[in-house]
A protein has these predicted regions:
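Positively charged n-region of N-terminal signal peptides that target proteins for export
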Residues: 1-4
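Bacterial N-terminal signal peptides
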Residues: 7-16
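Mixed-charge, low-complexity intrinsically disordered regions
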Residues: 17-78, 83-155
Length: 155
């Protein structure tokens, strides 16, 4: 159950618009932008907790979200198989691009600590981090949103 949910979480997100066919998991609008900005800010303030967890893991499925820009479009991607060294995260792009063409699923990507827009990991069936998902819950059917809310370690 955790793996399919993780794939769903890793697929969800965001920003800007374009005319091409987009993956159905790409969320371009409909969420509260101020709530999303606050979620990203909270994630960045708490990223040292994630780095500590990554260096001494008590959970699994560690991931970091990175904004990637190409031709004026910005899309957020989850990186998996994360490492952190010299103030940089490195990982594998975990979802298909929908708006940018300078990256592909399975590609290695590196980003500075301050560039991360979110982070997450699982422990004992609970999800830590993934703050950027919370503003998206209002857009989901209530049953689906309730399932995700029950998985969050923090409200």
């Amino acid at each position: 159950m955790i793996r399919p949910l993780m794939a769903s979480w890793l697929s969800l997100f965001l920003l800007c618009g374009c005319g091409q066919s987009l993956p159905e998991t790409l969320v371009k609008s409909g969420y509260d932008e101020k709530e999303m900005e606050a979620a990203i800010s909270l994630s960045q303030r708490e990223i040292d907790l994630f780095i500590t967890e990554l260096s001494q893991p008590t959970g699994n499925n560690h991931a970091v979200k990175v904004p990637i820009t190409d031709a004026g479009e910005t899309e957020h991607f989850w990186l998996t198989d994360i490492t952190f060294q010299n103030n940089e995260f490195s990982g594998i792009i975990g979802n298909e691009p929908g708006m940018v063409s300078n990256v592909k699923i399975g590609q290695t990507w590196t980003l500075k600590k301050h560039e991360a827009s979110d982070w997450m990991f699982m422990r004992d069936g609970k999800m830590y981090g993934n703050y950027t998902m919370r503003p998206l819950l209002k857009m989901m059917p209530e049953e689906e949103a309730a399932m995700y809310r029950s998985m969050f370690a923090e409200p």
